[in-house]
Amino acid sequence: MSFSVETKEELARIQPRRRCCQLAELAALFRMDGSLQISGEQGLSLTVSTESASSARKIFRLIKAVFGVQTQILVRRKRRLKKSNVYVISLPARIGGRDVLQEMGITDSQGGFSFEPPSELLKRQCCRRAYLRGAFLGGGSVNSPEGTYHLEIITNDETHARILSELLHRFGLTAKVSQRKGWFIVYLKESEQIVEMLSIIGAHSALLNFENVRIVKGMRNQVNRLVNCETANLNKTVDAALRQTEMIRFVQNRIGFANLPSQLREVAELRLQYPDASLKELGQMLNPPVGKSGVNHRLRRLESLAEAFSRQGGVPRED
């Protein structure tokens, strides 16, 4: 089971206690996955389809809690691809004189289709959380924290995408909206904001799993950076030591250590004797000991001698 599916399974088990939150979440689910249908028996009805059995059960419970009716769940089997089940739930447009569509913000007071949920439905913060939870259940997904950080909610309604983005902004999340093949994607890319989103919609187990993986991933990346840095530094040290050794052998063969000042002769002999030693270690072997900069200065003088000899073809004086 993917991380996204696990997150949705957790959300499907959440049952809001307050009727206002139940209505807000149900409205989001129907707006994401619902459609209006007209039949001879029921007349106008609102139908929602989902491939998740747990989401279907949640919708069933929410309808019963909000409107006091029990609906039937029709199970259909896909004939193509994975051949998974599709759960279809229908809700009459009117129940006991109540306008269900208007209560959920699907239609306005004049009976026309409403492109935006009414402000009354989202005036409380708890209801805004519930609405976002329903929207994520209906059309959301989140990548495993092992990979690229990404959470998105997909809708075919540009206005609804804007509303979802504005809701997220009210919680301090900088959601962005993009369009892909006629669909509108509201998405988050930053790990901290994804964690906050999981908290907002109540996916606390998913949040903990996400954080655990993110911490381990961060530590692993930090260790890799340190190892790469140490490796790079070691490579530089080895390359420098090899270059210095070759240069000193050139000086030894062409000039001779006997012609060098004692300070240069001492550091040259130590470098040949200890080719893997660092500048600090070489400095501690000198008598008297000197620091890294002092050793580096002497090696540079040797390098200058070698370059001068190579250019002039003779032995330069080193006072």
From Swiss-Prot:
Q: What are its GO biological-process terms?
A: cell division; regulation of sporulation
Primary role: Involved in cell division and chromosome segregation.
Keyword vocabulary terms for this entry: Cell cycle, Cell division, DNA-binding
Q: One of this protein's Pfam families, by short name?
A: HTH_WhiA
Q: Which gene encodes it?
A: whiA
The entry's family comment says:
Belongs to the WhiA family.
Report what the protein is called: Probable cell division protein WhiA
What's a single GO MF annotation on this record?
A: DNA binding
Residue ranges for the DNA-binding region feature of this UniProt entry: 278-311
InterPro entries in the record: Homing_endonucl, Intein_endonuc_central, Sporu_reg_WhiA_N_dom, Sporulation_regulator_WhiA, Sporulation_regulator_WhiA_C, WhiA_LAGLIDADG_dom
The cysteines joined by S-S bonds are: none
